[in-house]
Amino acid sequence: MSDLAQKFKDTVDYVQNADGDFEPSNELKLKMYALYKQATEGDVSGKKPGMMDFVGRAKYTAWEELKGMSADDAMQAYIDAIEELKS
């Protein structure tokens, strides 16, 4: 595993296990979701959720906007966003 991949994994673990009162905005949640999906799965795939599936459609659209971003760039952007929140 590369250093970047390990740091990404550590950052994801930190986010999933973080304690405290921090409640991220929906916008931040979507950004982090999209970066995670782009880093782990690549470009968006599958059918876009229907108009009445507001959450699913928002997630799909956020991920779709990252189309073409490399996994390494997505990992680094995810790490950078969390580091910025921690400071």
Predicted features, each with a name:
Residues 3-87:
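A charge-rich, low-complexity, intrinsically flexible signal that marks solvent-exposed coils, linkers
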